[in-house]
Curated annotation (Swiss-Prot):
Source taxonomy: Eukaryota, Fungi, Dikarya, Ascomycota, Saccharomycotina
Task performed by this protein: Mitochondrial intermembrane chaperone that participates in the import and insertion of multi-pass transmembrane proteins into the mitochondrial inner membrane. Also required for the transfer of beta-barrel precursors from the TOM complex to the sorting and assembly machinery (SAM complex) of the outer membrane. Acts as a chaperone-like protein that protects the hydrophobic precursors from aggregation and guide them through the mitochondrial intermembrane space.
Cellular compartments per GO CC: mitochondrial inner membrane
GO terms of biological process kind: protein transport
Organism: Zygosaccharomyces bailii
Domain-level remarks: The twin CX3C motif contains 4 conserved Cys residues that form 2 disulfide bonds in the mitochondrial intermembrane space. However, during the transit of TIM9 from cytoplasm into mitochondrion, the Cys residues probably coordinate zinc, thereby preventing folding and allowing its transfer across mitochondrial outer membrane.
Disulfides per UniProt: C35-C59, C39-C55
Family annotation (InterPro entries): Mito_inner_translocase_sub (IPR050673), Tim10-like (IPR004217), Tim10-like_dom_sf (IPR035427)
Name of this chain's protein: Mitochondrial import inner membrane translocase subunit Tim9
Gene: TIM9
Domain of life: Eukaryota
Length: 87
């Protein structure tokens, strides 16, 4: 990134921010869809039952922990690949 001029650096930063936002929105959408599908079964009321609320809390926590673990594994893999290239 050092070889880019200030304008190019700014454009590159905007691209990175856009991609990060897009990735976050995809993660959020997947979370909502999955937990809603798995947990919400009763459409006779406009409110969630306590069972549905508990299910959604557990589902979202599990989903986010899984996503975090996957991200960490990718970081570890990238670090290992970087070390292998540095030799």
């Amino acid at each position: 990134m050092d070889s880019l001029n200030p304008r190019e650096q700014q454009e590159f930063s905007k691209l990175i921010e856009h991609k990060q936002m897009k990735d976050f929105m995809r993660l959020y959408s997947n979370l909502v869809e999955r937990c809603f599908t798995d947990c919400v079964n009763d459409f006779t009321s406009s409110k969630l039952t306590s069972k549905e609320q508990t299910c959604i809390s557990r589902c979202s926590e599990k989903f986010l922990k899984h996503s975090e673990r996957v991200g960490l594994r990718f970081q570890e893999q990238n670090a290992a690949m970087g070390q292998g290239l540095g030799r």
